[in-house]
């Protein structure tokens, strides 16, 4: 209120000893009003996770991402219930300590339990349900997404968050994933056409 009434851009927050503890700007207030449910850290910055894979230079990628300020690392491969995943999680934990790790992808009870036992902080569930994933086409193996979410929940219940990855074509898919046990839902194609999404903009040639 003070910012808008006095038409000032910044308002420092001080204690009784006149020590500055923070700074509020009109941009901060506008952001809070427009995006009240955004996930932010203690400094008010958006939380960011980045994928590093599980082979090759994944440790170097993790190091550079953490240096850039990433909050969480995503170790994801097509088949997360594997020795490759176990090795990657062990290496990341050994090198970077308690950094939050999301592991995936799995689609079975055993796979979810495997990732839980590895000590990941969240489990990514889904093998092939999304438009961009070719695992089912190339291997002829996969589990329907809602069944995969439910099996993962049976394995870990409330102990580890489950992230439903893929298969969201309509708003009802988000609802179904959440009631089946997912704590969060990843969106790919649903957001790929937005202005904020990276990639080339291809305009319709037809008038």
Label each PLM-derived region with a short phrase.
Residues 1-7, 14-15, 31-33, 57-64:
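The conserved cystathionine-beta-synthase
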Residues 3, 9-24, 49, 73-76, ...:
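Cytosolic beta-strand hydrophobic patch enriched in CBS
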Residues 4-7, 17, 42-44, 55-56, ...:
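Short flexible coil/turn linkers enriched for glycine and charged/polar residues
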Residues 19-21, 25-39, 57-61, 77-101, ...:
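Active-site-adjacent beta->alpha loops and helix N-cap segments on the catalytic face
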Residues 50-59, 64-73:
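Active-site beta->alpha loop and helix N-cap motifs at the rims of alpha/beta catalytic domains
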Residues 51, 118-121, 140-164, 168-207:
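Alpha/beta catalytic cores of nucleotide-metabolism and tRNA/nucleoside-modifying enzymes
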Residues 41-51, 92-107, 122, 155-166:
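Short beta-strand/loop segments at the ligand-binding rim of alpha/beta enzyme cores
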Residues 60-68, 101, 106-125, 168-183:
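Catalytic cores of alpha/beta
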């Amino acid at each position: 209120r003070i910012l808008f009434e006095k038409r000032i851009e910044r308002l420092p927050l001080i204690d009784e000893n006149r020590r500055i503890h923070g700074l509020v700007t009109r941009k901060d207030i506008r952001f809070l009003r427009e995006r009240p449910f955004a996930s932010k850290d203690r400094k008010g910055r958006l939380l960011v996770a980045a994928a590093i894979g599980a082979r090759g230079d994944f440790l170097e990628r993790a190091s550079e991402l953490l240096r850039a300020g990433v909050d969480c690392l995503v170790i994801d491969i097509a088949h997360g219930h594997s020795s490759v995943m176990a090795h990657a999680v062990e290496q990341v934990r050994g090198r970077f300590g308690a950094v939050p790790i999301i592991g995936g992808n799995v689609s079975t009870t055993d796979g979810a339990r495997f990732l839980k036992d590895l000590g990941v902080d969240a489990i990514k569930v889904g093998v092939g349900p999304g438009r961009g994933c070719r695992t089912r086409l190339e291997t002829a193996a996969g589990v329907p997404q809602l069944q995969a979410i439910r099996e993962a929940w049976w394995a870990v219940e409330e102990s580890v968050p489950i992230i439903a990855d893929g298969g969201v074509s309509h708003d009802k898919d988000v609802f179904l994933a959440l009631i089946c046990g997912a704590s969060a839902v990843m969106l790919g194609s649903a957001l790929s056409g937005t202005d904020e999404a990276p990639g080339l903009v291809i305009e319709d040639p037809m008038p």
